């Protein structure tokens, strides 16, 4: 009887072993004895590997691209820019408000695309507008703010011939509200051609590419660190892209401006410098070197001083969290004082009504 029982248990054990080897055996059980569940979650690729293995030389990032530590906490990398592929190791540029959007890679959420964290608003004539907000800066235009950019369309289509404002016909009076704007609208039809977007671009042949570039826009701030931009195709792919640079016209400290000495018999001091060199600060990071830049000065009358001659330099910034990045910057060599003062970012500054 005992031999029969032993044989039965042995055969049952062998059968269970064979079934498991063939993959047809019973499901694994949990520690509590319940049948385990097979997970349907896809396996994600592991981008981080420890211990860390980093190249001996740090990567050289293009100007404007941050040098940061990767998401694994190991090596220095060039941060990914808007539209580039990112993952848990290849981080997006933190100094530009970017994050890795994994929404397209469902359900793995393994790789994403760098995108801006929040759609920023717009600033025009010292007034802040929210993203998507429609506003009317003057009677001629209606504008829309979209992620820091402003687009405007004319509210009127001028009629250059057959004007109903030339005189009343049949004893009827014309609408004086529209007639008062008609001289402005007539000039609007041609004056737009003087704006920067319609000017001929400077042309340069370089490496089989016809290089084109618009003029740099005025600095976004009259004091402190600002940004100016232009559109150019001076790149490896010869594609039209927006290029940005830092600009620093004047310090914002009013006490510094009070110390500027205007020569006797003069009403303006076009340029001035601080007594000692200082480091630039941008996005919470400071320049690796100290600089003594030339600033545009002040006038006793209503004139303002703007850069006249300048060159471009590259500034290296280091951050508290061991990251770093480079930016191109406007380096002023001389300034000129004029009565035609414009607010920074005024997109209508060159639209002249004659």
Swiss-Prot record:
Entry annotated with the keyword Transmembrane: no
Q: Which domain of life is it from?
A: Eukaryota
Question: Which PANTHER family would you find in this protein's record?
Answer: CELLULAR COMMUNICATION NETWORK FACTOR 6, CONNECTIVE TISSUE GROWTH FACTOR-RELATED
Bridged cysteine pairs (disulfide): 48-72, 52-74, 54-75, 61-78, 86-100, 92-114, 268-305, 285-319, 296-335, 299-337, 304-341
Effect caused by changing residue 228 to P? In PPRD; uncertain significance
* Gene label: CCN6
Predominantly, its location class is: secreted
Q: Which SMART domains match?
A: CT, IB, TSP1
Spans traversing the lipid bilayer: none
Q: What is this protein called?
A: Cellular communication network factor 6
Domain named CTCK: residues = 268-342
Question: What disease does the Swiss-Prot or TrEMBL record associate with this chain?
Answer: Progressive pseudorheumatoid dysplasia: An autosomal recessive disorder characterized by stiffness and swelling of joints, motor weakness and joint contractures. Signs and symptoms of the disease develop typically between three and eight years of age. This progressive disease is a primary disorder of articular cartilage with continued cartilage loss and destructive bone changes with aging.
């Amino acid at each position: 009887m005992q031999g029969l029982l032993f044989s039965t248990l042995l055969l049952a054990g062998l059968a269970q072993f064979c079934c498991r080897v063939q993959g047809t055996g019973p499901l694994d059980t949990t520690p509590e004895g319940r049948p385990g569940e097979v997970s349907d979650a896809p396996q994600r690729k592991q981008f981080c590997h420890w211990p860390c293995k980093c190249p001996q030389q740090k990567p050289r990032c293009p100007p404007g691209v941050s040098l940061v530590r990767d998401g694994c906490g190991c090596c220095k990398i060039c941060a990914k820019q808007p539209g580039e592929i990112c993952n848990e190791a290849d981080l997006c540029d933190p100094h530009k408000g970017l994050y890795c959007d994994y929404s397209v890679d469902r359900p793995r959420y393994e790789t994403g695309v760098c995108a801006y964290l929040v759609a920023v608003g717009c600033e025009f004539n010292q007034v802040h507008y929210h993203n998507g907000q429609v506003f009317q800066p003057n009677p001629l235009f209606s504008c829309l703010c979209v992620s820091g950019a402003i687009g405007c369309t004319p509210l009127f289509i001028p009629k250059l011939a057959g004007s109903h404002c030339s005189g009343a016909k049949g004893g009827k009076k014309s609408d004086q509200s529209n007639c008062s704007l008609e001289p402005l609208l007539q000039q609007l039809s041609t004056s737009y051609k003087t704006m920067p977007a319609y000017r001929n671009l400077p042309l340069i042949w370089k490496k089989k590419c016809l290089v084109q570039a618009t003029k740099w826009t005025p600095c976004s701030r009259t004091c402190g660190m600002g940004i100016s931009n232009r559109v150019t195709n001076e790149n490896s792919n010869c594609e039209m892209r927006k290029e940005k640079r830092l600009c620093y016209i004047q310090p914002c400290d009013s006490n510094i401006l009070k110390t500027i000495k205007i020569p006797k018999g003069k009403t303006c001091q076009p340029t001035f410098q601080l007594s000692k060199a200082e480091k630039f600060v941008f996005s919470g990071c400071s320049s690796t070197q100290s600089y003594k830049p030339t600033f545009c000065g002040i006038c006793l009358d209503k004139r303002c001083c703007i850069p006249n001659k300048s060159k471009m330099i590259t500034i290296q910034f280091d951050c508290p969290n061991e990251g770093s990045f480079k930016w191109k910057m406007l380096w002023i060599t001389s300034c000129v004082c004029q009565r035609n003062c414009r607010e920074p970012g005024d997109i209508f500054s060159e639209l002249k009504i004659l």
